[in-house]
A protein has these predicted regions:
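N-terminal signal-anchor/first transmembrane alpha helix
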Residues: 1-62, 105, 110, 127-128, ...
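Short alpha-helical functional segments enriched in proximate histidine and acidic residues
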Residues: 12, 74, 115, 119, ...
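Transmembrane alpha-helical segments of multi-pass membrane proteins
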Residues: 82, 154-162, 278
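Alpha-helical transmembrane segments of integral membrane proteins
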Residues: 2-3, 113, 121, 125-145, ...
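An internal, D/E-rich "acidic patch" concept
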Residues: 59-131
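Small-residue (Gly/Pro/Ala) motifs that create kinks and tight helix-helix packing interfaces
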Residues: 23, 164-169, 313, 343
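Hydrophobic aliphatic residues
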Residues: 26, 30, 39, 44, ...
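Hydrophobic alpha-helical transmembrane segments of membrane transport/permease proteins
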Residues: 16-75, 172, 176-216
Length: 357
């Protein structure tokens, strides 16, 4: 098991290099003249200005020279003559966002807790209810619940996210205002910035519980309900379908038939013999569901005006803010690599064949 974890950990730097090479390579599809526009507020009209920018930032240097400079930055003298490091994503310098008028790393610090708060509340129903429905559908094959679950899984995986989000916005907010877009109400914002509300984790819903403020927790939940439903319904439907298929296959295995022949209760056969083994494909799918979740937040946060990483990426894309998009893409890639590492380790704990291989 230890060797397996070590091998997976050693793979992380390789994956990071691959991600950064792909992202930086996509930027290099633009010529030096086009990329020079990223370093000035207005695109320079004078050819001498363009040449000066290209020369200063080495935009016509060989690919790997530019790539290394992008990773570690360069040392330049500041206005006082002191040598300072300019750039370098390995040092946390992802560049300056002209869309948000702040450093990209500050956007990540301010926005990622909001997306994480939303993701945590999305993953719980997605996994628990999706797996429960899949198991129940398999146990009741061809009965009413199974038919309903199969219909839901087909509809859920074929309904566009943004259309579903707009429908929720119209039904639950525009007509009834049961739930609200955005992150919080004005009175919660005033409470937070007054200093009376301690931000332990910077996750609003969690901090509300830690501060014993159920009114703040309910307000946070009212703002997250629609994004949670929108983000989870596709993966939820996928988990239902995969769990059902895996469970049906497991129920036909010899060891399950033997357990029934021994006279074990049906609940013990399902919960102790069939379901644990049926979870292996489900665990494998978790990595892909996280990818889908992070992809879905761009649309979902934009539809519901939720101030997370996805909304920041959408705003940057609308303004052609390439520096911000690259920084957020690298950070998202890092999150995906870590998430898949956790899933691989979890899979090894569940399946002894993996950790013993």
């Amino acid at each position: 098991m230890t060797n397996y974890i070590i091998r997976r950990l050693l793979l992380v730097p390789v994956l990071l290099v691959g991600v950064t090479l792909i992202i930086f390579g996509m930027l290099q599809l633009l010529g030096p003249v086009e990329r020079s526009a990223l370093y000035v507020v207005d695109f320079p009209k004078n050819e001498k200005q363009i040449d000066a920018v290209i020369k200063r930032y080495g935009l016509d240097d060989p690919f790997f020279v530019q790539y290394w400079r992008w990773l570690v930055g360069v040392q330049r003298p500041d206005t006082q003559g002191n040598i300072v490091r300019d750039g370098g994503i390995l040092y946390g310098d992802f560049g300056y966002s002209r869309t948000a008028s702040q450093e990209v790393i500050d956007i990540i610090k301010n926005r990622f807790p909001n997306t994480l708060d939303l993701a945590l509340w999305t993953i719980f129903p997605m996994l628990s209810v999706g797996i429960w429905m899949g198991v129940k559908a398999a146990v009741n094959q061809n009965k009413f619940f199974d038919q309903a679950a199969r219909i839901y899984s087909i509809i859920g995986t074929s309904f566009p996210t943004f259309v579903f989000g707009l429908l929720l916005l119209m039904l639950l907010y525009a007509n009834n205002q049961w739930f609200l877009p955005g992150k919080m109400s004005d009175w919660v914002s005033i409470l937070i910035y007054s200093g009376e509300f301690k931000q332990y984790t910077h996750l609003l819903s969690i901090d509300a519980l830690l501060n014993l403020r159920l009114d703040v927790f309910w307000d946070a939940l009212r703002h997250m309900i629609m994004p949670i439903i929108t983000l989870s319904y596709i993966s939820w439907a996928t988990f239902v379908r995969v769990t059902r298929s895996s469970m049906l296959e497991t129920l036909r295995m010899d060891y399950v038939v033997t357990a029934r022949a021994k006279g074990l209760k049906e609940s013990d056969v399902i919960n102790k013999h069939a379901r644990p083994n049926a979870m292996l494909p489900v665990v494998t799918m978790m990595g892909g569901s996280i990818v889908g979740l992070l992809g879905g937040v761009v649309i979902t946060e934009t539809v519901f005006n939720y101030p997370g990483i996805g909304k920041a990426a959408a705003d940057a894309a609308a303004q052609l803010d390439v520096v911000t998009i690259l920084g957020l893409a690298i950070f998202t890639g890092l999150i995906l690599i870590i998430s898949n590492l956790v899933v691989d380790i979890l899979y090894a704990f569940i399946d002894p064949r993996v950790r013993l291989s």
